[in-house]
Amino acid sequence: GQKEEKTFNMEKKTLKQRIKENPGLKQAVHRFIMHPVKTRPNWWIRLFDFIYLKRGKGSVIYRSVRKDLPPFNRFSLGKYSVVEDFSCLNNAVGDLTIGDYTRIGLRNTIIGPINIGNHVNLAQNVTVTGLNHNYQDAEKMIDEQGVSTLPVVIEDDVWVGANSVILPGVTLGKHCVVAAGSVVSHSVPPYSI
């Protein structure tokens, strides 16, 4: 009856689901994967990132790119997309998805949760982040208040000019252009500048 059904349902859970549901196990796995001080995975995890990072045909991530991509959130790079030198990719707090034929320019910082569409061009020194540090309690240190996330969505055929910042919760509509040096804190409709 009921006991058999419960056992059957537990067998369907993935390892990832079981880890997320067990706080002690989740903490142990996190300690194994992440360095205690640095905000990047331990070196032995980075050695095997080719196993869990999804990359499309012809995609390129230059060697100097910092890949803060632990396996507990999704990362995918579409076919024929490029991440140029000295950029930082980070999915520690949310999934990071980059579509096909997309170019992430020099020295970009991309912190999930983010969904970047197809044929998107991010010029040099662009920051796109779905992460924000909490600071509601003036009695507590900011670094003790945790973080919050709001997904960023960059739809297809968008161009973001150099030195721009795209903040959490923003959607850049299809075929829009963000001028160089912009700070984008509100969503931008499709086909606009």
Whereabouts are the PLM-identified features?
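Short, Lys/Arg-enriched N-terminal segments with co-localized hydrophobic residues
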Residues: G1-N9
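Domain-scale signature associated with acetyltransferase and cell-envelope carbohydrate enzymes
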Residues: F8-T129, E155-D156, S164, P190
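Glycine-rich hexapeptide-repeat left-handed beta-helix
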Residues: N115-I193
